[in-house]
From Swiss-Prot:
Any one GO cellular component localisation term in the record: cytoplasm
Species classification: Bacteria, Pseudomonadati, Pseudomonadota, Gammaproteobacteria, Enterobacterales
Protein name, per record: Protein-export protein SecB
Quaternary structure and partners: Homotetramer, a dimer of dimers. One homotetramer interacts with 1 SecA dimer.
Function comment: One of the proteins required for the normal export of preproteins out of the cell cytoplasm. It is a molecular chaperone that binds to a subset of precursor proteins, maintaining them in a translocation-competent state. It also specifically binds to its receptor SecA.
Gene that encodes the chain: secB
Family annotation (NCBIfam families): PRK05751.1-1 (NF004390), PRK05751.1-4 (NF004393), secB (TIGR00809)
Disulphide-bonded residues: none
HAMAP family referenced in this protein's UniProt entry, alphabetically: SecB
Coiled-coil ranges per UniProt: none
Family: Belongs to the SecB family.
GO terms under biological process: protein folding; protein tetramerization; protein transport
Molecular function GO labels: unfolded protein binding
Amino acid sequence: MSEQNNTEMSFQIQRIYTKDISFEAPNAPQVFQKEWEPEVKLDLDTASSQLADDVYEVVLRVTVTATVGEDSAFLCEVQQAGIFSVGGIDGTQMAHCLGAYCPNILFPYARECITSLVARGTFPQLNLAPVNFDALFMNYLQQSEGAAQQQDA
């Protein structure tokens, strides 16, 4: 038997934690005087690093910016991180695990932090919709392949 046949896929969450958190309301209290019809922008980013054999840190950065007219109402950024044990996979499967599966686990924690911070800033409730990290990962792969093909041309 080859060594590959003896290797089973394993996945375990070791820890989930808030790595960095920031909330700014640069135009308070004036922004509270305005009619609340915000334009809300959501930015997502992920990063991963190997800590040890089969142990990875994945960081999901979620930034929410709300503007009312020309004024910034609030800027909220959360870096939600997790330490994961992942074994028995490599290549595209590992990239998918670290780039989509783990961020999908982290997002509800980041969403709760953002919702809490916005409420503590006394702004109306902010409900962030679930994110399809699998679709975002597939889009990233397609863009990467397109960029590689353009460089080869």
